[in-house]
C-alpha cells in the first residue's frame, strides 16, 4: 500500500502540466495536497515511533536476486520525512504564486518539483540499500532538471550540469560503498546492518566508509565539492528554497546519520568528517557576509550549516548527535522561510541586491515579519529553535575531552558570522529609510508568497516553547535512531550548564559588534 501510494505521487507529479492546464491558478494548491497528505499520515506515526517502535513495509522487487523495496520509519526517518513533506507542501503553494500562471515552464516545474518531493520522501524512508540508491539518483536527476528549468539561459544550463556531474560522481562512489557494505555484512537492509552490529577493520570496510562519505560530501556540498551549491542559485527561488534548505542538500547529512551506528567507531570516520565539516562551516560563514545578493548569502550560510552538521556527526559523541538532530530541524525551518521571503522580496521589488534594498517594512509587513522571525532564529537568539540548536552545539564542544577548545572557538566564530549575515538581510533592507536613488516601490504580495515564510518563521519560534513535547516526540527518537542506541535528548530554553549560556551570550555580543 505504501509503495502504491508513493508511485501514485509520482504519477500525480507527471500529471502536473495537465493539472496546470485544467485548473490554472489553483494547480499549486491541488498538487500541494499530495505532500500535505503524506505529512498528515506521518503525524499519526509519531506516538508509535516515539515509543521506540519503527514502522516498516516491504514488497518483493527482484525475486531472483532477493531484492526487496523495503521501507523503515524510525525517529530519524520520521523527522526527515516530516521536513520533506511539510516544507514540500508549502513550497508547492509558494511556487504557483512565485512563477505565476503565465510562466511557460510552470507545468514542467510542477512535474519535476512534486516528483522530487516524492523521491526525497522515498530516500529518507528507504531501508533497502538498492532502494535507497535508486531514490538517491532520482534526486540528482530531478535537481538537474529543476536547476536547469530555464534552459534558455547559459548560466542555468552550466549550473545544472555542474550539479549533476558532482552529485552524479558522488553517486557512483556511494554505489560502490553500498555494494561493499551489503556484500561484506551479508545484509541489504540498513536496519538489519545496524542491528547486527556489523563492523570491521578490513580494508573493504574502510573502503565502504570512504566511498559512502564521498557520496554524502558531494550531495551535501562539503569542501571541496561545494561549488555547485552557490552556482545553483540561478534556479527559480522555489527550487532554492526546497532543494537547498530542506531537501537535497540534507540527503547527504541524512545518509551520514543513517550509517553512523555502523561506521562511527572507525578512526577514519572522524578523520574524514571533522576536517571537512569544520572547513565547510567556517568558509561558508565567511563567504556569506561577503555577498550582496540575498540568495547567495543564504547559499553560503547553508554551506556553513551543512558543515556544522557534518562536523557534529564526525565528533562521534551522543551530545553531538543530539545537537545535529536539533540543528537539522532548526535549519530546515529558518532557511526555508528565508529563501521564500527572499523570493517574495525579489518578486515585489525586482532585485535581491541588499545594497539597493531599503525600507521594505511599510510596503511588505508580513514578509518582513517572516524574514525577521527566521533571521533571528538563524542568528541563534533566544528564544528560538535556532538558539536551542546553538546551545546543544556549544554543549557538545564543552563535553569533548580533546579538541574542545578548537571546536568552541570555531563554533563561536561561525555563530558570530551567522548573526552578521542575518543582520545583513534584515536591518537595512527592512527597517532603514528608503533611498531616493533606489526607488523600488515595494508592494504587498499574495498569500501564496507569504504563507510559507510566515508558517516556517513562526515555527522557528513557537516550537522553542514546546521543549518537552519536541524532546519526547522528535529529538529523542531521532537522536536515538541516528546513534543506534537510546539517547535522552532533552532540550532546555535555559541551559543547565552556565558555560553554555556564557558562550552563547559571547557569540551574540560579538555578532552585534561585527
Regions of interest found by a model, annotated:
Residues 32-47, 170-178, 371-379, 452-471:
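Hydrophobic alpha-helical membrane-insertion segments
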Residues 53-65, 189-196, 392-396, 469-495:
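Membrane-interfacial helical/loop segments at transmembrane boundaries in membrane proteins
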Amino acid at each position: 500500500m505504501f509503495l502504491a501510494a508513493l508511485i501514485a505521487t509520482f504519477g500525480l507529479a507527471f500529471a502536473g502540466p495537465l493539472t496546470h492546464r485544467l485548473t490554472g491558478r489553483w494547480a499549486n494548491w491541488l498538487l500541494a495536497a499530495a505532500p500535505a497528505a503524506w505529512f498528515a499520515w506521518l503525524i499519526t506515526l509519531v506516538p508509535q515511533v516515539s515509543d521506540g517502535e519503527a514502522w516498516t513495509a516491504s514488497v518483493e522487487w527482484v525475486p531472483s536476486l532477493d531484492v526487496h523495496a523495503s521501507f523503515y520509519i524510525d525517529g530519524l526517518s520520521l523527522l526527515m520525512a516530516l521536513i520533506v513533506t511539510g516544507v514540500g507542501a508549502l513550497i508547492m503553494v509558494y511556487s504557483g504564486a512565485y512563477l505565476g500562471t503565465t510562466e511557460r515552464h510552470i507545468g514542467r516545474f510542477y512535474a519535476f518539483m512534486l516528483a522530487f518531493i516524492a523521491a526525497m520522501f522515498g530516500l529518507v524512508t528507504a531501508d533497502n540499500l538498492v532502494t535507497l540508491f535508486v531514490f538517491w539518483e532520482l534526486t540528482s536527476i530531478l535537481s538537474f532538471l529543476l536547476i536547469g528549468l530555464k534552459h534558455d539561459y547559459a548560466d542555468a544550463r552550466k549550473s545544472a550540469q555542474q550539479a549533476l556531474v558532482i552529485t552524479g560522481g558522488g553517486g557512483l562512489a556511494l554505489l560502490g560503498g553500498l555494494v561493499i557494505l551489503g556484500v561484506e555484512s551479508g545484509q541489504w537492509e540498513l536496519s538489519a546492518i545496524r542491528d547486527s552490529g556489523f563492523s570491521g577493520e578490513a580494508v573493504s570496510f574502510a573502503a565502504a566508509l570512504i566511498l559512502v562519505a564521498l557520496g554524502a560530501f558531494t550531495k551535501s556540498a562539503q569542501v571541496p565539492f561545494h561549488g555547485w551549491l552557490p552556482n545553483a542559485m540561478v534556479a527559480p527561488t522555489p527550487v532554492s528554497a526546497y532543494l537547498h534548505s530542506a531537501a537535497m542538500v540534507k540527503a547527504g547529512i541524512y545518509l551520514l546519520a543513517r550509517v553512523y551506528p555502523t561506521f562511527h567507531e572507525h578512526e577514519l570516520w572522524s578523520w574524514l568528517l571533522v576536517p571537512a565539516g569544520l572547513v565547510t562551516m567556517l568558509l561558508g560563514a565567511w563567504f556569506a557576509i561577503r555577498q550582496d545578493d540575498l540568495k547567495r548569502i543564504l547559499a553560503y550560510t547553508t554551506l556553513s550549516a551543512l558543515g556544522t552538521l557534518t562536523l557534529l556527526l564526525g565528533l562521534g559523541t551522543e551530545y553531538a548527535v543530539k545537537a545535529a538532530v536539533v540543528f537539522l530541524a532548526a535549519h530546515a525551518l529558518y532557511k526555508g522561510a528565508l529563501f521564500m521571503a527572499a523570493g517574495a522580496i525579489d518578486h515585489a521589488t525586482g532585485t535581491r541586491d541588499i545594497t539597493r534594498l531599503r525600507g521594505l517594512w511599510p510596503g511588505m509587513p508580513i514578509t518582513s515579519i517572516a524574514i525577521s522571525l527566521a533571521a533571528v532564529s538563524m542568528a541563534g537568539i533566544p528564544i528560538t529553535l535556532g538558539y536551542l540548536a546553538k546551545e546543544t552545539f556549544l554543549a557538545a564542544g564543552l563535553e569533548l575531552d580533546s579538541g574542545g577548545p578548537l571546536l568552541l572557538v570555531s563554533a563561536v566564530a561561525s555563530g558570530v558570522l551567522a548573526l552578521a549575515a542575518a543582520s545583513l538581510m534584515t536591518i537595512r533592507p527592512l527597517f532603514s529609510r528608503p533611498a531616493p536613488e533606489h526607488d523600488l516601490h515595494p508592494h504587498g504580495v499574495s498569500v501564496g508568497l507569504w504563507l510559507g515564510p510566515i508558517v516556517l518563521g513562526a515555527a522557528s519560534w513557537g516550537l522553542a516553547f514546546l521543549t518537552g513535547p519536541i524532546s519526547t516526540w522528535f529529538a529523542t527518537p531521532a537522536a536515538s535512531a541516528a546513534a543506534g542506541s537510546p539517547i535522552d535528548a532533552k532540550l532546555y530554553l535555559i541551559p543547565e550548564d552556565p558555560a553554555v549560556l556564557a558562550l552563547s551570550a559571547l557569540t551574540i555580543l560579538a555578532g552585534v559588534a561585527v
